[in-house]
Amino acid sequence: MNIQAFLSEKISMAMSAAGAPADSEPLVRQSAKVQFGDYQANGVMGAAKKMGIPPRQLAEKILEHLDITDIADKVEIAGPGFINIFLSPVWVAQQAEFALADEHLNITKVTPETIVIDYSSPNVAKQMHVGHLRSTIIGDASARTLSFLGHNVIRANHLGDWGTQFGMLIAYLEKKQNENAADMALADLEEFYREAKKCYDEDEVFAERARNYVVRLQGGDEYCRTMWRKLVDITMQQNQLTYQRLNVTLTEDDIMGESLYNPMLPGIVADLKAKGLAVESEGATVVFLDEYKNKEGEPMGVIIQKKDGGYLYTTTDIACAKYRHEQLHANRVLYYIDSRQHQHLMQAWTIVRKAGYIPDSMSLEHHMFGMMLGKDGRPFKTRSGGTVRLTDLLDEAHERALTLIREKNPDMDEEELNNIARVVGIGAVKYADLSKNRTTDYIFDWDLMLSFEGNTAPYMQYAYTRVASIFKRADIDESALTQPISLTQPHEKQLALRLVQFDETITQVAREGTPHVMCAYLYDLAQSFSGFYENCPILSAEDDNVRQSRLKLARLTARTLKQGLETLGIETVDRM
């Protein structure tokens, strides 16, 4: 149950009955301090100001119309007009029981929407590097979260699989095949791309053949498409291994590359011209947007077709949004693309809406993110200044975690050691990113992310194993816990309340695409459990009813931690 939404609705009705303006927001929040109750409504001041009356006077009127005696022990007015709500321990215990009995932790059922999530988007014939990490893992956390809530999620891997460079790559692939060197791993493709560029720059005969292949590929030539497909397949087979290592849910079926939209581009340019939105300007086709001004204060021109007939990323993005409405019937489209692309996307979407390609009800959202920086505050690079390949980063994460786990468990079996190191190492890299507000840059620091203290993956994974181990030591089946949850101690209520706040947390993450909110919640939950564990004996509780109640809270904690980490794509292990 979403307590915040429930209280917001109740207080909103009471505000209306008290004569507050129709647009008044109750502004219900979880209280920061226990003396202010469990929840606080902060919207009275704003409403009272509009009405021209003292906030406390309005607050008193609201309380006359507020009926939440079945869920709250006490409701009080504090300060100038805050409404503090103290929830009943009996009611909180009941909500915890409902969560424990439900495989989805009693999450509020949603009206399913079709949500397209555009993320990862590597390029063909290039290895994935650290620049792809944020889009890939933040986008995947969003996909997992929305799927868990019951939405129809369509993952869209917008692969860079089209463009003039493919003439050069096809010509070089042909050359390599003639030299019997056709079987390439993606590691060779990095060198392959450089060698192809070298041939293109230095050999005019090769360059002419490459230009010819571009024309043939765009015209649908079967030979060129076969060679192009081979380049795409080699790339994606290797990328798929990286996705599996990262525990990312993307598959080859999720590829919706630039080539998918290419057949739509001539029609879109013609249509924008026919609608009077696009005009010829210095040989190119341009859309002038009043919403964006250049340095001279004139409408900014957005090129959709170059003088030589070539199309731009903007044209593809216009086609992409149109396709996602017409073919995928999307209600929402979430783009996990870095913040530097914001204006480009906004311009493309402005054209899309002006052209009437999507309905007003369809939401296009740029869930932008900042950069990953080294300890020096500069973009994360190798020591020699090169781009860090994602496979190298994940290898190092595994090695560092292996050293750490081996030190703590010198007698552990090698296979188990490697599995735990894999889960901890990859989890550490992902969690370090996901736990930061995605809109900001963040510092990549091995020591911090692999620490067993603080808001890190190792701490969270250890917290889960610690809670799960209680049940093993109890040697009791969950079905044998027949006594109800009872909250008589402050730490019991604090833990139970935090557990049932999972609903409102995941709702916020789904709405805003902010996995750091889930990380903060899980860290706080783990700390609440620590306080509960230290102050409320579980297995040594003298009263069996109390013992069963506390075991139930421990079980719900383990399930909530595991489910929360799963929405982030972070694995857990049974022991560390």
Curated annotation (Swiss-Prot):
Signal peptide: none
GO molecular function, one term: ATP binding
Biological process, per Gene Ontology: arginyl-tRNA aminoacylation
UniProt-listed Enzyme Commission number(s): 6.1.1.19
Any one cellular-component term (Gene Ontology): cytoplasm
Alphabetized Gene3D superfamilies for the sequence: Arginyl tRNA synthetase N-terminal domain, HUPs, Isoleucyl-tRNA Synthetase, Domain 1
Group of enzyme by EC: ligase
Superkingdom of origin: Bacteria
Intracellular or extracellular location(s): Cytoplasm
Catalytic activity field: tRNA(Arg) + L-arginine + ATP = L-arginyl-tRNA(Arg) + AMP + diphosphate
PROSITE patterns reported for this sequence: AA_TRNA_LIGASE_I (PS00178)
Motif 'HIGH' region in this chain: 122-132
Keywords carried by this UniProt record: Aminoacyl-tRNA synthetase, ATP-binding, Cytoplasm, Ligase, Nucleotide-binding, Protein biosynthesis
Family recorded in the similarity comment: Belongs to the class-I aminoacyl-tRNA synthetase family.
Quaternary structure note: Monomer.
Name the record gives this protein: Arginine--tRNA ligase
UniProt source species: Proteus mirabilis (strain HI4320)
